[in-house]
Regions:
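Short, aromatic/basic amphipathic alpha-helical patches
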Residues: 72-83
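N-terminal pre-Walker A segment at the start of P-loop NTPase domains
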Residues: 1-16, 67
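Conserved P-loop NTPase motor cores
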Residues: 14, 28-49, 58, 65-69, ...
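Active-site catalytic pocket residues across diverse enzymes, especially alpha/beta-hydrolases
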Residues: 49-50, 80
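Alpha-helical structural elements
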Residues: 6-8, 52, 89, 97
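Short acidic-hydrophobic, aromatic-tinged amphipathic segments that line or gate anion-handling sites
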Residues: 83-101
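Phosphate-binding P-loop
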Residues: 12, 16-25, 52
Protein backbone atom coordinates (compact mmCIF):
# COMPACT_ATOMS: atom_id res chain seq x y z
CA UNK A 1 0.00 0.00 0.00
CA UNK A 2 1.34 3.41 -0.98
CA UNK A 3 1.23 5.67 2.07
CA UNK A 4 1.87 9.30 1.24
CA UNK A 5 2.89 11.90 3.81
CA UNK A 6 0.23 14.33 4.88
CA UNK A 7 0.97 17.84 3.73
CA UNK A 8 1.73 19.87 6.83
CA UNK A 9 1.59 23.54 7.62
CA UNK A 10 5.31 23.98 8.22
CA UNK A 11 7.26 26.82 6.65
CA UNK A 12 10.74 26.73 5.22
CA UNK A 13 13.56 28.74 6.76
CA UNK A 14 17.03 29.57 5.41
CA UNK A 15 19.38 26.67 6.06
CA UNK A 16 23.14 26.27 6.12
CA UNK A 17 24.80 24.32 3.33
CA UNK A 18 27.04 22.61 5.89
CA UNK A 19 25.73 19.51 7.66
CA UNK A 20 27.66 20.57 10.76
CA UNK A 21 25.39 23.52 11.51
CA UNK A 22 21.92 22.89 12.97
CA UNK A 23 18.77 23.44 10.95
CA UNK A 24 16.60 26.46 11.69
CA UNK A 25 14.77 27.08 13.95
CA UNK A 26 17.59 25.89 16.20
CA UNK A 27 18.08 25.46 19.94
CA UNK A 28 21.77 25.89 20.61
CA UNK A 29 23.89 25.72 23.75
CA UNK A 30 27.32 27.42 23.72
CA UNK A 31 29.35 26.14 26.68
CA UNK A 32 32.71 27.59 27.65
CA UNK A 33 34.67 29.73 30.09
CA UNK A 34 34.77 33.50 30.06
CA UNK A 35 37.08 34.67 27.29
CA UNK A 36 36.82 31.41 25.37
CA UNK A 37 35.40 33.10 22.28
CA UNK A 38 31.69 32.29 22.63
CA UNK A 39 30.49 35.80 21.86
CA UNK A 40 32.73 36.21 18.81
CA UNK A 41 31.60 32.84 17.46
CA UNK A 42 27.93 33.69 17.88
CA UNK A 43 28.30 37.14 16.31
CA UNK A 44 29.95 35.58 13.26
CA UNK A 45 27.28 32.89 13.08
CA UNK A 46 24.58 35.57 12.96
CA UNK A 47 26.16 38.19 10.72
CA UNK A 48 28.42 36.25 8.33
CA UNK A 49 26.42 35.18 5.24
CA UNK A 50 28.72 32.19 4.74
CA UNK A 51 26.86 30.40 7.53
CA UNK A 52 23.09 30.91 7.03
CA UNK A 53 22.98 33.49 4.27
CA UNK A 54 22.44 37.22 4.40
CA UNK A 55 19.20 37.31 6.37
CA UNK A 56 18.23 34.06 8.10
CA UNK A 57 16.24 35.94 10.78
CA UNK A 58 13.94 38.93 10.52
CA UNK A 59 14.60 40.06 14.11
CA UNK A 60 17.42 39.41 16.59
CA UNK A 61 17.29 39.86 20.38
CA UNK A 62 20.45 39.71 22.51
CA UNK A 63 20.27 39.56 26.31
CA UNK A 64 23.58 40.09 28.13
CA UNK A 65 24.79 42.03 31.19
CA UNK A 66 27.24 43.85 28.88
CA UNK A 67 24.83 44.38 25.99
CA UNK A 68 25.22 48.16 26.09
CA UNK A 69 28.99 48.32 26.55
CA UNK A 70 30.56 45.29 24.85
CA UNK A 71 32.55 46.41 21.79
CA UNK A 72 32.46 42.83 20.48
CA UNK A 73 28.76 43.39 19.72
CA UNK A 74 29.45 46.25 17.31
CA UNK A 75 29.16 44.03 14.17
CA UNK A 76 25.75 42.89 15.41
CA UNK A 77 24.67 46.47 16.07
CA UNK A 78 25.50 47.39 12.49
CA UNK A 79 23.82 44.22 11.20
CA UNK A 80 20.45 44.77 12.90
CA UNK A 81 20.39 48.42 11.80
CA UNK A 82 21.75 48.14 8.25
CA UNK A 83 20.55 44.68 7.16
CA UNK A 84 17.49 43.91 9.27
CA UNK A 85 16.37 47.54 9.62
CA UNK A 86 15.18 46.62 13.11
CA UNK A 87 13.70 49.66 14.86
CA UNK A 88 15.74 49.98 18.04
CA UNK A 89 13.27 52.39 19.62
CA UNK A 90 10.20 50.20 19.18
CA UNK A 91 11.73 46.72 18.97
CA UNK A 92 15.19 46.88 20.62
CA UNK A 93 17.75 44.17 20.03
CA UNK A 94 19.89 44.60 23.12
CA UNK A 95 18.85 44.00 26.74
CA UNK A 96 21.04 43.93 29.86
CA UNK A 97 18.87 41.29 31.52
CA UNK A 98 16.29 38.67 30.60
CA UNK A 99 13.35 41.01 30.01
CA UNK A 100 10.62 38.44 30.60
CA UNK A 101 7.70 40.76 29.83
CA UNK A 102 9.25 41.99 26.58
CA UNK A 103 10.33 38.55 25.33
CA UNK A 104 6.96 37.05 26.24
CA UNK A 105 5.31 39.62 23.98
CA UNK A 106 7.83 38.83 21.23
CA UNK A 107 7.03 35.11 21.43
CA UNK A 108 3.29 35.76 21.46
CA UNK A 109 3.67 38.02 18.43
CA UNK A 110 5.53 35.22 16.65
CA UNK A 111 2.71 32.81 17.42
CA UNK A 112 0.14 35.20 15.96
CA UNK A 113 2.27 35.87 12.88
CA UNK A 114 2.67 32.14 12.27
CA UNK A 115 -1.05 31.44 12.68
CA UNK A 116 -1.93 34.33 10.38
CA UNK A 117 0.49 33.08 7.72
CA UNK A 118 -0.96 29.58 7.94
CA UNK A 119 -4.43 30.99 7.29
CA UNK A 120 -3.35 32.85 4.14
CA UNK A 121 -4.39 31.64 0.69
CA UNK A 122 -2.09 30.92 -0.97
CA UNK A 123 0.01 30.15 2.07
CA UNK A 124 3.54 31.64 2.07
CA UNK A 125 6.31 29.08 1.81
CA UNK A 126 8.93 31.03 3.75
CA UNK A 127 8.51 31.46 7.49
CA UNK A 128 9.15 34.59 9.54
CA UNK A 129 12.06 33.59 11.78
CA UNK A 130 13.60 35.40 14.74
CA UNK A 131 16.57 34.71 17.02
CA UNK A 132 16.85 35.10 20.80
CA UNK A 133 20.33 34.94 22.36
CA UNK A 134 20.78 34.69 26.13
CA UNK A 135 24.46 35.39 26.76
CA UNK A 136 26.08 34.77 30.17
CA UNK A 137 22.76 35.10 31.97
CA UNK A 138 22.16 31.44 32.74
CA UNK A 139 23.23 32.07 36.35
CA UNK A 140 21.04 35.17 36.69
CA UNK A 141 19.41 35.74 40.06
CA UNK A 142 16.76 38.19 38.84
CA UNK A 143 13.24 36.78 38.43
CA UNK A 144 14.65 33.25 38.39
CA UNK A 145 11.25 31.50 38.30
CA UNK A 146 9.80 33.66 35.52
CA UNK A 147 13.07 33.61 33.58
CA UNK A 148 13.27 29.83 33.88
CA UNK A 149 9.75 29.41 32.56
CA UNK A 150 10.56 31.70 29.64
CA UNK A 151 13.74 29.80 28.74
CA UNK A 152 11.86 26.48 28.94
CA UNK A 153 9.23 27.89 26.59
CA UNK A 154 11.92 29.03 24.14
CA UNK A 155 13.43 25.56 24.01
CA UNK A 156 10.15 23.60 23.94
CA UNK A 157 7.37 25.52 22.16
CA UNK A 158 8.80 28.59 20.47
CA UNK A 159 10.49 26.67 17.64
CA UNK A 160 7.02 25.89 16.24
CA UNK A 161 6.62 29.63 15.68
CA UNK A 162 9.97 30.16 13.97
CA UNK A 163 11.98 31.16 17.05
CA UNK A 164 15.63 30.09 17.20
CA UNK A 165 17.32 30.24 20.61
CA UNK A 166 20.97 30.32 21.64
CA UNK A 167 21.93 29.97 25.30
CA UNK A 168 25.54 30.93 26.04
CA UNK A 169 26.84 29.83 29.43
CA UNK A 170 29.97 29.03 31.44
CA UNK A 171 28.38 26.08 33.23
CA UNK A 172 26.00 23.32 32.19
CA UNK A 173 24.18 22.84 35.49
CA UNK A 174 22.56 26.14 36.43
CA UNK A 175 19.01 27.14 37.49
CA UNK A 176 17.97 28.36 34.03
CA UNK A 177 19.38 25.31 32.25
CA UNK A 178 16.66 22.88 33.26
CA UNK A 179 16.40 19.23 32.18
CA UNK A 180 13.81 20.41 29.63
CA UNK A 181 16.36 22.76 28.11
CA UNK A 182 19.15 20.18 28.07
CA UNK A 183 17.10 17.48 26.33
CA UNK A 184 15.69 19.86 23.70
CA UNK A 185 19.04 21.21 22.55
CA UNK A 186 19.69 20.58 18.84
CA UNK A 187 23.30 21.80 18.80
CA UNK A 188 26.08 22.22 21.38
CA UNK A 189 29.27 24.20 20.87
CA UNK A 190 31.80 23.30 23.56
CA UNK A 191 34.98 25.22 24.28
CA UNK A 192 37.77 24.33 26.70
CA UNK A 193 36.10 23.73 30.04
CA UNK A 194 37.29 24.85 33.44
CA UNK A 195 37.80 21.46 35.05
CA UNK A 196 37.66 17.71 34.55
CA UNK A 197 34.47 17.70 36.63
CA UNK A 198 32.70 20.02 34.17
CA UNK A 199 33.93 17.91 31.27
CA UNK A 200 32.54 14.81 32.98
CA UNK A 201 29.18 16.54 33.48
CA UNK A 202 28.99 17.35 29.79
CA UNK A 203 29.96 13.84 28.69
CA UNK A 204 27.42 12.27 31.04
CA UNK A 205 24.69 14.52 29.61
CA UNK A 206 25.39 14.20 25.89
CA UNK A 207 27.45 11.08 25.16
CA UNK A 208 24.72 8.44 25.42
Amino acid sequence: MDIRPIEGLEFSFPQAESDVLPSLPMRMLALGNSGSGKTTTLINLITDPRFYGKRPWERVYWCSPTAAADDALEPLRRYVEDVLKQDQEVDPTFHDHIDVAFLTKVIERQRKITERMKAMTPRPKKGFGILVVIDDLADARRNVLQSGQLVDSLFIKARHWGVSTILSTQKLRLPLISPCVRVNVTCVIVYRLRSKYEKTQYLEEYSA
